[in-house]
C-alpha cells in the first residue's frame, strides 16, 4: 500500500515536475521584441495634433446644415384617435373608482 502513495508525494525531480507541453504554447508565453523599434519624437506628435484639430473643425462646420422643423409636420391629438374627451366626466369617473378602492382596503388584514 505504501507504493501507491509515492505518485502523490511531492518531488524535486525536474522530470516529474516538468510543465505540460500541451499548455506551453497557449495564451501566455514569452514576449517577443518588435523587429523595428518605433521612434516617438516630439516632431511626430505635433504633426498628429494638427491633423486632429483639422478633423474637429470639419465636424463643427457640418452641424450647421440642419433645417428648422416645419410646424405642418407635427401631428397633434393622435393619441385620442379623433375622439372628443369630456374631462369633467372623466374626472367624475376617477373619483367614483377611488371610492371603490377604499372599500377594498378595509377588508385587508396584514
Curated annotation (Swiss-Prot):
Subcellular location: Nucleus
Keyword Membrane: no
Presence of keyword Oxidoreductase: no
Pfam families in the cross-refs: CHZ (PF09649)
GO cellular component: nucleus
Region Disordered, annotated ranges: 1-110
InterPro entries tied to this protein: Histone_chaperone_domain_CHZ
SMART domains found in the cross-reference section: CHZ
Polar residues compositional bias, start-end: 1-14
Record field: compositional bias (Acidic residues): 41-64, 97-110
Keywords from the named record: Chaperone, Nucleus
Superkingdom per UniProt: Eukaryota
Recorded family membership: Belongs to the CHZ1 family.
Function as written in the Swiss-Prot or TrEMBL entry: Forms a chaperone-bound H2A.Z-H2B complex that acts as a source for SWR1 complex-dependent H2A to H2A.Z histone replacement in chromatin.
Subunit relationships: Forms a heterotrimer with H2A.Z-H2B, stabilizing the association of the histone dimer. Also, with a lower affinity, forms a heterotrimer with H2A-H2B.
Name of this protein: Histone H2A.Z-specific chaperone chz1
Lineage: Eukaryota, Fungi, Dikarya, Ascomycota, Pezizomycotina
Gene: chz1
Amino acid at each position: 500500500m505504501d507504493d501507491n502513495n509515492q505518485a502523490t508525494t511531492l518531488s524535486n525531480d525536474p522530470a516529474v515536475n516538468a510543465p505540460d507541453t500541451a499548455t506551453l504554447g497557449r495564451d501566455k508565453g514569452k514576449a517577443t521584441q518588435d523587429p523595428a523599434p518605433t521612434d516617438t519624437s516630439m516632431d511626430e506628435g505635433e504633426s498628429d495634433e494638427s491633423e486632429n484639430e483639422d478633423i474637429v473643425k470639419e465636424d463643427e462646420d457640418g452641424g450647421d446644415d440642419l433645417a428648422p422643423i416645419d410646424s405642418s409636420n407635427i401631428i397633434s391629438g393622435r393619441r385620442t384617435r379623433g375622439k372628443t374627451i369630456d374631462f369633467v366626466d372623466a374626472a367624475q369617473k376617477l373619483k367614483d373608482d377611488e371610492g371603490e378602492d377604499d372599500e377594498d382596503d378595509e377588508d385587508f388584514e396584514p
